[in-house]
Swiss-Prot record:
Keywords: Aminotransferase, Pyridoxal phosphate, Transferase. GO terms for biological process: lysine biosynthetic process via diaminopimelate. One of its GO terms (molecular function) is pyridoxal phosphate binding. Homodimer. Its EC number is 2.6.1.83. Pathway: Amino-acid biosynthesis; L-lysine biosynthesis via DAP pathway; LL-2,6-diaminopimelate from (S)-tetrahydrodipicolinate (aminotransferase route): step 1/1. This is LL-diaminopimelate aminotransferase. It comes from the Bacteria.
Length: 388
C-alpha cells in the first residue's frame, strides 16, 4: 500500500535545520573538514554541578515513574524564584508556570490551545520556523510581519491593517531575536501590550535568549511590563542558558488562563518532562550562576573574532548585543543561498541562508558562534581566501 502524506505535510518546506544537518553529514562523509556555523546548538558542556544532580536524581527510583503533566511543583517554584530574582516578576508557581519538554515543544503546541481553523496569527519574518508551522498545523493562517534593518528588526505594528488586526488571535514575538540578533526595549513591549489590548490579541513571547547577552546588557522579560500578564505568556528554555539542548527542559509563564489551555493540550499529547531532569533544572536555576557568566564571556570572545574578521574581508555584519548569532548581509550580487552554497562548496563552512527564515531574510546569512574560537578564526581565514 502506498503511503500518502497528510495534506498539511505536503505544504511544509524541508525543515531548515534538518537540511543543514544533511548537507553537513554529506560533506563530512566525503572527508571535508566542515566548520558548522549553521545550527544554534551550544558546543559547550552542561555545567558539572547540573550533571551531578541529574545522576543522583536518576538513581532515585521515585523519579522513574510518570511525572506530573504540568511539571513538578518544586521545579515550578524554582522557576518562579528565578523570575523574581532575574526580572523582578512575581509568579504564582501553581497557576502561572507550566513545565515544558523544551520550549520548542510548548511553542509547537501553543496554537492548538488558542487558534481555531481560519484564525489569524501575526508571525514575524524572518523567524524561527516553528511559529508559522505550528499555526498551520492548528488550522490557522499566518500574517507575516517583516523584520527589516530600517526598523531595528522589530515588527512595525502601525503598518498592520486594521482588518487584519481585528482578525488576529495571537501575535508571536521573539527578543533577543533569532535569527537577527536584535533586541527589544520597553517602548516596543509597551506598544505590543497596547496593540494586544486594543485588538484582543494573545501575545506569545519566545524569550529563549535572554541570558545570552554581552557587555553588561540585560535583556528584558516581556512580563516586566505593566499589563503583560493580562495579555500573554512567555516561553523560556534551559537549553541555551545552561547548555542543555539535549535535555529538553523549558517552561512557559504568564497568564494563568492561557497556560491552563496549553496544559490541557499537553496532558492529551505528552506525559511531562522526566523528573530527574527537572531536579537538575532546579539546580541550574538555583545554583551558582557563574557558569552563565562564563558562557557569556566565551561567546563574546568568539563574537569579537568573527565580527572583526568579517569586517576585515569587506562584509558588514550586524553586531548583536545578545544571542549567539551573527546576521550578516551577503556580498553584492549574491543571494542568501548563493553565498551559503559558496561557503559550503569552496570553504567547507556551513552558514544558514537568511531566506530559509522567511522572505525578508533574503540577502543575509546567519552564523552561529557554536565552535571554539580557533575554529572561528579558521572560518574567517577560509572566507578571506574566497573570491566574492
Amino acid at each position: 500500500m502506498a503511503f500518502v502524506k497528510a495534506e498539511r505535510l505536503k505544504l511544509l518546506p524541508p525543515y531548515l535545520f534538518q537540511e543543514i544537518d544533511r548537507l553537513k553529514a554529506e560533506l563530512t562523509a566525503k572527508g571535508v573538514d566542515v566548520i558548522n556555523l549553521g545550527v544554534g546548538d551550544p558546543d559547550l558542556p552542561t555545567p558539572d554541578h547540573i550533571i551531578a544532580r541529574l545522576k543522583t536524581a536518576a538513581e532515585d527510583p521515585s523519579t522513574h515513574q510518570y511525572p506530573s503533566y504540568s511539571g513538578m511543583n518544586d521545579f515550578k517554584v524554582s522557576v518562579a524564584g528565578w523570575y523574581k530574582r532575574r526580572f523582578g516578576v512575581e509568579l504564582d508557581p501553581l497557576s502561572e508556570v507550566l513545565t515544558l519538554i523544551g520550549s520548542k515543544e510548548g511553542l509547537a503546541h501553543f496554537p492548538l490551545a488558542v487558534i481555531n481553523p481560519g484564525d489569524l496569527a501575526l508571525v514575524p519574518t524572518p523567524a524561527y520556523p516553528v511559529y508559522h508551522v505550528a499555526t498551520m498545523f492548528a488550522g490557522g493562517e499566518s500574517y507575516f510581519m517583516p523584520l527589516v534593518r530600517e526598523n531595528g528588526f522589530l515588527p512595525d505594528l502601525d503598518s498592520i491593517p486594521a482588518d487584519v488586526a481585528r482578525r488576529a488571535k495571537v501575535m508571536f514575538i521573539n527578543y533577543p531575536n533569532n535569527p537577527t540578533g536584535a533586541t527589544a526595549e520597553r517602548d516596543f513591549f509597551e506598544k505590543v501590550i497596547a496593540f494586544a489590548r486594543e485588538y484582543d490579541v494573545i501575545v506569545c513571547h519566545d524569550a529563549a535568549y535572554t541570558e545570552m547577552a554581552f557587555g553588561g546588557y540585560r535583556p528584558l522579560s516581556f512580563l516586566e511590563l505593566p499589563g503583560a500578564g493580562e495579555v500573554g505568556v512567555e516561553f523560556h528554555s534551559l537549553s541555551k542558558t545552561y547548555n542543555m539542548t539535549g535535555w529538553r527542559l523549558g517552561f512557559a509563564v504568564g497568564n494563568a488562563d492561557i497556560l491552563a489551555g496549553l496544559g490541557q493540550v499537553k496532558s492529551n499529547i505528552d506525559s511531562g518532562a522526566f523528573n530527574a531532569v527537572q531536579w537538575a533544572g532546579i539546580t541550574a536555576l538555583e545554583g551558582d550562576q557563574g557558569c552563565v557568566v562564563e558562557m557569556q564571556r566565551i561567546y563574546k570572545e568568539r563574537l569579537d573574532i568573527l565580527i572583526e574578521g568579517l569586517k576585515r574581508i569587506g562584509l558588514h555584519p550586524e553586531v548583536p548585543r545578545a544571542t549567539f548569532y551573527v546576521w550578516c548581509p551577503t556580498p553584492p550580487g549574491y543571494s542568501s543561498k548563493d553565498f551559503s552554497s559558496l561557503l559550503l562548496r569552496e570553504a567547507g563552512i556551513v552558514a544558514t541562508p537568511g531566506s530559509g527564515f522567511g522572505a525578508p531574510g533574503e540577502g543575509y546569512i546567519r552564523m552561529a558562534l557554536t565552535v571554539d574560537k580557533e575554529r572561528v578564526r579558521e572560518a574567517v581565514e577560509r572566507m578571506r581566501k574566497l573570491s566574492f
